[in-house]
Amino acid sequence: RIDHYFGQVFEEMFGGGKGQLILEDPENPLTCGIEIRVQPPGKQVKTITLLSGGEKAFVATALYFAILKVRPTPFCLLDEIDAALDDRNVDRFAGYLHNLKKTQFIVITHRRGTMEAADVLYGVTMQEQGVSKLLRLDLNQMEEYLGIGE
């Protein structure tokens, strides 16, 4: 089932292409390795080892999201999962989070595209040496206040 969802999530996140998980020894699925083969749009089929760092991170994220489709969790913490992604893939990643409605995400990020897709932002700032302050910004309330909501 994870392979099915991986192909689906891969295609949605990459805007096309194909993703596939292949058991190295189908006779022993619990002890064998898994080969990840992908074909990003407009490219040839590759194993994950031949991808760039950003592509590897995006494929790993697609795999994680496929697992969440099979086994949803109520809560998920992602720490700078978007750090190696280019701006286009940051936007795709952030947009895809909204497809996983059964899971609440806390995403630690420095990327603007991810922040823009959030419902609520929390920030930590230090206004004076050694004293941290927590900031909270509810983007939906802010849009209503400014009259710029959908």
PLM-predicted stretches and their roles:
Residues 1-150:
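Terminal ABC-like ATPase head and other globular end-domains that cap long coiled-coil arms
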